[in-house]
Amino acid sequence: MGSEMCIRDRDVGIRDRSMLELLYACGLRVSELVGIQLTEVILSDGVIRVTGKGSKTRLVPMGEEAVDWIKKYLVKSRQNILNKQTSKFLFVTNRGGEMTRQAFWYLIKKYALMANIDKPMSPHILRHAFATHLINHGADLRVVQMLLGHSDISTTQIYTHVARERLKKLHQEHHPRG
């Protein structure tokens, strides 16, 4: 029984890391993450088809790291977690059921605690970091809008405030007249 638990713990850990990597790499909403179906993962192209608000779909690139973790999860861990059950969803709970938003929130809190992160942590913080990092590294606002699935550009413009603050700080630190 002990070795079975170790394998199960490892498989659940791989699932959790895959979820975290995908959430950050794609800037997904939690509902989008837990709702991903196997047929929406296109590993050969490194993209996922995401169904967002208003049932609008978009293709989002996953990035190499997320693809690698998803592959690890799909090769063996997912089947071990399912334990002879089936599911159309990419991510499943420890009992083989559909992952819920609440269950994922619990995971985020658990890992933040384990990492001694004493600031409030939520899945939306990773979505916010995704958008902020893209904008800070020069991504076009319209591209970020598409990746986030925002229907209105003004929703995406919130993230430019963070970029402006960063630019102001960098100017003050590095310019002789800053």
List each model region and its residues:
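Conserved catalytic core of the tyrosine transesterase superfamily
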Residues: 3-4, 8-178
